[in-house]
């Protein structure tokens, strides 16, 4: 089974899937369009969240970073006048250093991800969507800004006029992603932000065509017609669709099975169920529902 994931929503589903499927049967391809270099190291927020979730290290209060991490280095940098865009924990930073060292030595992001996966003892396969650089750029009245500047530094306050993926036209799917598309019969599009998390993955050359003969399942990130979290509604409006499940499908494209919340207004063919995943039990129940659909 191939899972397409961002850094929110889908990791909660993953913690359920690994309890009902052999983890070795799961391949996760993760959005990298929100990556950025901070203090000399490459931070891959969505990849890190997926890796830490699969390693049972994720801070489930915030759904980013490592549970119980300290922030000594981040605090000391602030004290000496170094401003970091993200709050980076000390253990979290160690993996950023490993990733960056691999890349500086000529390796790819996929190579670095594999080293981290092995170090954490993760049995599932995890790949970046691409080894090429892609950046989500948000257009606002204040000008264009990287997603992390918009969401973290400016707390998502500026008006969103547009969203684009810089570098997407030249980027290729990672070799691990290509192989997974050849090998897997089922693709699950996780409940991550459809615009900034899933759309970059689907926009890579050849991905939609390669999914055409797969069994496809999409889990809506909306609770009724509202996102569970984050700025998804504003991004959806910025790309010209309504922030409802019909809008989600217009971004994702047609799928074989579309799972929505019980309160969704979606008029098309879908499976209505409880899509909240506030607990491991809820995540596991939804994972079982997906397995039932794909046989």
Name each region found by the language model.
Residues 200-209:
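Charged helix-capping and loop-helix junction motifs
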Residues 30-165:
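Electropositive, gly/pro-rich neighborhoods at or near active sites that engage anionic ligands
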Residues 33-34, 214-229, 275:
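Short, flexible loop segments at boundaries between secondary-structure elements
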Residues 27-31, 215-222, 257-262:
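Short internal beta-strands
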Residues 1-49:
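Gly/lys/ser-thr-rich phosphate-binding loops in alpha/beta enzymes
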């Amino acid at each position: 089974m191939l899972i397409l994931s961002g850094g929110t929503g889908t990791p909660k589903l993953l913690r359920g899937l690994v309890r009902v499927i052999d983890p070795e049967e799961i391949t996760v391809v993760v959005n990298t369009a929100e990556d950025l270099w901070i203090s000399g190291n490459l931070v891959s927020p969505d990849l890190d969240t997926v890796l830490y979730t699969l390693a049972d290290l994720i801070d489930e209060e915030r759904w980013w970073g490592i549970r119980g991490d300290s922030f000594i280095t981040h605090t000391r940098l602030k004290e000496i006048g170094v401003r970091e865009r993200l709050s980076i924990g000390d253990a979290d930073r160690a993996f950023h250093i490993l990733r960056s060292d691999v890349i500086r030595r000529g390796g790819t992001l996929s190579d670095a991800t594999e080293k981290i996966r092995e170090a954490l003892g993760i049995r599932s396969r995890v790949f970046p969507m691409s080894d090429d650089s892609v950046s989500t750029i948000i257009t606002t009245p204040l000008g264009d800004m990287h997603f992390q500047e918009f969401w973290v530094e400016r707390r998502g306050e500026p008006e969103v006029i547009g969203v684009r993926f810089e570098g997407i036209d030249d980027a290729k799917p990672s070799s691990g992603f290509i192989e997974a598309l050849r090998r897997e019969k089922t693709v699950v599009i996780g409940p991550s932000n459809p615009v900034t998390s899933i759309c970059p993955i689907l926009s890579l050359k050849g991905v939609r065509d390669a999914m055409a003969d797969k069994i496809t399942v999409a889990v809506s990130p909306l609770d009724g017609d509202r996102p569970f979290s984050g700025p998804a509604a504003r991004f959806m409006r910025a790309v010209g669709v309504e922030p409802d499940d019909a809008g989600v499908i217009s971004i994702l494209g047609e799928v074989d099975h579309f799972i929505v919340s019980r309160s969704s207004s979606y008029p098309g063919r879908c499976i209505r169920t409880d899509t909240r995943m506030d607990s491991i039990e809820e995540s596991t129940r939804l994972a079982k529902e997906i397995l039932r659909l794909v046989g």
